[in-house]
Design a protein with these regions (language model features):
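Mature catalytic core of soluble alpha/beta enzymes
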Residues: 1-117
């Protein structure tokens, strides 16, 4: 994002990386921020407690799908995905909690974030 990176990931081997978030593409109307990602259940802009989700996966299609799915599902969706053997995630919520998949070589750069267990 424009404020800088939260951290960095060291990858061994190739993979696809997709990030979903509402921090760059949004519209603010009467003080309320509307994300560009549409909730498929309501047809309205997504309301979520996450600010960003990044997925590392062997498939570009899957990484894009998963980053959007997890972002729209919010923090209640994260636990289902943190221990996957098929992909890894890094996500942050509005309270600056950080969610990182087990086994992902992630280095935190921004000390204002804290790891969420």
């Amino acid at each position: 994002n424009k404020q800088g990176s939260i951290g960095s990931v060291t990858l061994r081997g190739g993979c696809f990386i997709s990030t979903s978030g509402g921090y760059e593409r949004y519209e603010e109307i009467d003080g309320k921020r509307y994300c560009h990602i549409i909730d498929t259940k309501t047809g309205y802009p997504t309301e979520t407690d996450l600010t960003t989700v990044t997925v590392f996966c062997d498939s570009g299609l899957e990484s894009d799908f998963l980053s959007t799915l997890i972002f729209t599902g919010g923090t209640k969706e994260i636990e289902k995905h943190l221990s996957s053997d098929n992909y890894k995630i890094v996500a942050a919520d509005k309270d600056k909690n950080l969610y990182v998949s087990d086994g992902l070589d992630f280095k935190l750069k921004d000390g204002s974030y804290k790891y969420k267990q």
